[in-house]
Regions:
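An amphipathic, hydrophobic-aromatic interaction surface with interspersed Lys/Arg
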Residues: 1-71, 75, 79-104, 108-206
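Alpha-helical oligomerization segments
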Residues: 196-236
Length: 236
């Protein structure tokens, strides 16, 4: 068990904000929702971030963008300190807070806060930690073995069908809730680790060397060895 990742998972699940102080004022960086992520996405594009340098030397690249684009950085931080849709869409309030940040912080302060925001999305880290990436590979291989049969699938080409529709259909949430009321990390983890069931036909069971008309839940950790054995038997 990786204690730090477990702590990160708990913080993500409970949507715990990161707090900081500027002068006598306290602020919180709230986990971004899907709606906030879309707002920030436009500002990130304006920063002209060098993804290669950010991966190689995140502190240096973060310092650079804070020096070159302080106004945009302060707006990003300002947006990140609001939690609800009403405040996020209140442009005047966002700009007022951004102006306060610019007048009361150094480049180093901005870089430190921006680094926290940049590193807030730990979805891929969680996916690897829980072995969900391995499940994805297994399901992809099983999909190839099973083939398409007589079914055709359409849609899921954009975030509307892939994530928003998934959440609304599965949990009965409104689009407004999906956009503004659940963190982007939690939303992505619900999608990535959703339980699915794979039904094996008689022919497929014959190919896998398994009989008995079993329905195999490929997302159940207890079935991982069985699924791997099925794939191994088929490949062998």
């Amino acid at each position: 068990m990786d204690k730090q990742i477990e702590i990160n998972v708990s913080d993500a699940l409970t949507e715990t904000p990161v707090r900081f102080r500027i002068g006598k004022r306290d602020f919180s960086i709230y986990p971004p929702t899907l709606g906030k992520t879309q707002i920030l996405k436009k500002l990130y594009l304006e920063l002209d971030i060098n993804a290669g340098l950010l991966a190689l030397n995140p502190l240096a690249e973060t310092m650079r963008v804070c020096k070159e684009y302080p106004d945009i950085v302060c707006r990003i931080i300002s947006y990140s300190t609001f939690a609800d849709r009403k405040n996020l869409l209140n442009v005047e309030k966002v700009y007022q807070r951004a102006a306060f940040l610019k007048d009361n912080t150094s480049v180093e302060d901005l870089a430190t806060i921006l680094s926290v925001i940049f590193s807030s999305d730990k979805t891929e880290e969680f996916i690897k930690y829980f072995g969900i990436d391995a499940d994805r590979e297994q399901k992809a291989r099983i999909g190839k073995i099973k083939g398409e049969g007589s079914s055709l699938t359409f849609g899921g080409k954009s975030i509307y069908g892939l994530l928003i529709d998934f959440a609304c259909q599965r949990y009965g949430w409104t689009m407004d809730y999906v956009l503004w009321c659940i963190s982007y990390v939690n939303l992505n983890m619900l999608f990535a680790d959703a339980i699915t069931t794979v039904y094996l036909t008689d022919e497929e069971r014959r190919q896998f060397g398994k009989g008995g008309g079993t329905v195999v839940n490929a997302d159940d950790p207890g079935n991982k060895d069985l699924v791997r054995k099925m794939i191994s038997d088929y490949d062998g």
